[in-house]
Amino acid sequence: VGEGKVKVITPDGTSENGNIPAVFIKKDTLIQQVELELSNFQNEKETFIFVDQVYADKHQVTSTTQTTVQLKEKMLETGNHTITAVQYENNDPKGKVISFNQATFETKPAS
């Protein structure tokens, strides 16, 4: 929905073109940051970021904004995870969704 795009960027690659890049998690990691690129969202609206449907952050996005999101707890578990970027009418999360885009990344244990 909408023209906004979210891209996950890891040392392994990006989520561009449906790719699923890996994030390697060391055994005792409590928090891991992942880089995001947000583009083509309406800049007068806030963009809400969710990881696995859990609210993580919100940003005012210009034409292209690079930021990070913190992975913690279940987000660090091995497997695929989804980042969702959403904009709502009147910046109200209970309101109508006007932009919605997702990207997937995979967490793997670091050797």
Positions of predicted regions on the chain:
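Primarily secretory-pathway and cell-envelope proteins
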Residues: V1-E46, P93-S111
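Aromatic/pi-system hotspot detector in well-structured domains
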Residues: E46-F48, Y88
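Short strand-turn-strand beta-turns centered on an Asx-Gly dipeptide
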Residues: F50-V54
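Local beta-strand/beta-hairpin segments that build beta-sheet-rich folds
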Residues: Y55-K58, K72, I98
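Short beta-strand segments within Ig-like beta-sandwich modules, predominantly Fibronectin type-III
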Residues: D57-T65
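Short strand-edge motifs at loop-to-beta-strand transitions and within beta-strands
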Residues: T65-V69, N101-A103
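Surface-exposed, short loops/turns at beta-strand junctions within beta-sandwich domains
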Residues: K72-N80
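Beta-strand-rich extracellular modules
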Residues: T84-N90
